[in-house]
Amino acid sequence: MDYTLTRIDPNGENDRYPLQKQEIVTDPLEQEINKSVYMGKLEHALHDMVNWGRKNSIWPYNFGLSCCYVEMVTSFTAVHDVARFGAEVLRASPRQADLMVVAGTCFTKMAPVIQRLYDQMLEPKWVISMGACANSGGMYDIYSVVQGVDKFIPVDVYIPGCPPRPEAYMQALMLLQESIGKERRPLSWVVGDQGVYRANMQSERERKRGERIAVTNLRTPDEI
């Protein structure tokens, strides 16, 4: 099998990622104002029920690239019990999964394989980039390592760390669940708007900025 890795031109035409034009729009719920009270409330309730089922039954695809995968599977142990979030059903096939966790270093030879696995996943699907290597290449600023998996697939949640702790992975699942709960996808092929709307989530750094600035008592360097 021949592997190729093509750099994406954000301003050019590309039949792969991004698979559709992405732009920031106003809240899609505002269009419900123009509908009748009954149909607007009914469609809003249907979206909430569908998103509740999706966010509480996330099936991750079982594969790993490097040491971050060890931290990922640690969250499945009884100590952390990721089953509380409905994400314990590991799938051996991408066609049965809706979450891909890129855990570890993404080498240039592995990038086309990850791209193909992502294409085989059915919608709706989400991606978590776990660890510094998956986010930006980490300390491997060399020709053989892709400097971030978001160069060729869309990423929903980034987990910093080298490697991140299992608690960080579980927090990423909670953030992903929050994002899924605010999504608006077509209820069917013929009913409602056919566009996919994803909430513009605030980064954790920005969300906690005020709380961190307000801290007056700092811990000493020898404390954990």
Swiss-Prot record:
[4Fe-4S] cluster binds at C67, C68, C133, C162. Binds 1 [4Fe-4S] cluster. Keywords: 4Fe-4S, Cell inner membrane, Cell membrane, Iron, Iron-sulfur, Membrane, Metal-binding, NAD, Quinone, Translocase, Transport, Ubiquinone. Pfam families: Oxidored_q6. InterPro entries: NADH_UbQ_OxRdtase-like_20kDa, NADH_UQ_OxRdtase_20Kd_su. Its cofactor is [4Fe-4S] cluster. GO terms for biological process: aerobic respiration; electron transport coupled proton transport. It is a peripheral membrane protein. GO terms for molecular function: 4 iron, 4 sulfur cluster binding; iron ion binding; NADH dehydrogenase (ubiquinone) activity; NADH:ubiquinone reductase (non-electrogenic) activity; quinone binding. It is found in: Cell inner membrane. It comes from the Bacteria. Its EC number is 7.1.1.-. Coiled coil: none annotated. It catalyses: a quinone + NADH + 5 H(+)(in) = a quinol + NAD(+) + 4 H(+)(out). One of its GO terms (cellular component) is plasma membrane. PANTHER family: NADH DEHYDROGENASE, NADH DEHYDROGENASE [UBIQUINONE] IRON-SULFUR PROTEIN 7, MITOCHONDRIAL. NDH-1 is composed of 13 different subunits. Subunits NuoB, CD, E, F, and G constitute the peripheral sector of the complex. Belongs to the complex I 20 kDa subunit family. NDH-1 shuttles electrons from NADH, via FMN and iron-sulfur (Fe-S) centers, to quinones in the respiratory chain. The immediate electron acceptor for the enzyme in this species is believed to be ubiquinone. Couples the redox reaction to proton translocation (for every two electrons transferred, four hydrogen ions are translocated across the cytoplasmic membrane), and thus conserves the redox energy in a proton gradient. NCBIfam families: nuoB_fam, PRK06411.1. This is NADH-quinone oxidoreductase subunit B. The gene is nuoB.
